[in-house]
Amino acid sequence: MKKERLDVLLTVQGLAPSRERAKRLIMAGQVLVNEQRVDKAGATVPADAVLRVVGEDLPYVSRGGLKLAKGIAAFGICLAGRTAADIGASTGGFTDCMLQNGAVKVYAIDVGYGQLDWKLRTDARVVNMERTNIRKVTPDMLDHAPDFASIDVAFISLDKVLPVVRTLLSPEGEVLALIKPQFEAGKDRVGKNGVVRDPAVHEDVIARVLVAAEGLGFVPRGLTFSPVKGPKGNIEYLLYLGMQGGRTAIADEEIAAVVEEAHRTLDG
């Protein structure tokens, strides 16, 4: 049986108006192939596969924007008139959300290539820094020090990224970091298919990230959970940090309460 790229087939079947839109739907996890979710736009599938688009149309180029949107709402973050950095930009869901919330410039930084959505690539407010490892970025590479940075990275611990981010931010800078237990816990604590389900491991991971952040001089300002799971089904958490002022600690009891609510909400 002949195979086609999923984004092409979705467009040919009239389920998306363009390949760019098809890619966004696929990467948002909204496309089922023979009732199985596929989230890789370049995946090849049988030409006679039954495709179905599910869920509501996203307000951002990817569902990553929903994560940042929750952080903005939960913590009252204001991005109007600010310069921001989207670290681990990928398709640009966070970047899109930043722009829609008034950011005047966004540095979209990602080690990958060709992932950033076309509408963001062509937006004059976006500086596309693809093929760029955040650990190699220095302040002189940015025209303006970001006032805000989001961090959504994979296969690396936040304790390797936060030190670099601190050197890039303005003195009043803020950070919203996505804590992913599967990349923070040791391999022996990661379960089948790369999923960490144990709430105790989640609590420990969050506590250790907090210690690392505070050791760098960041001030914890808030903690909540992501409204959507990661691609493999991992629950993720949003940690809000400042460079000065604000709160001084997030107690173990608060961490436990956030983890419990996350599991109750997302795992039912």
Label every PLM stretch briefly:
Residues 107-160:
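S-adenosyl-L-methionine
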Residues 181-198:
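Short, glycine-/aromatic-enriched active-site segment of Class I SAM-dependent methyltransferases
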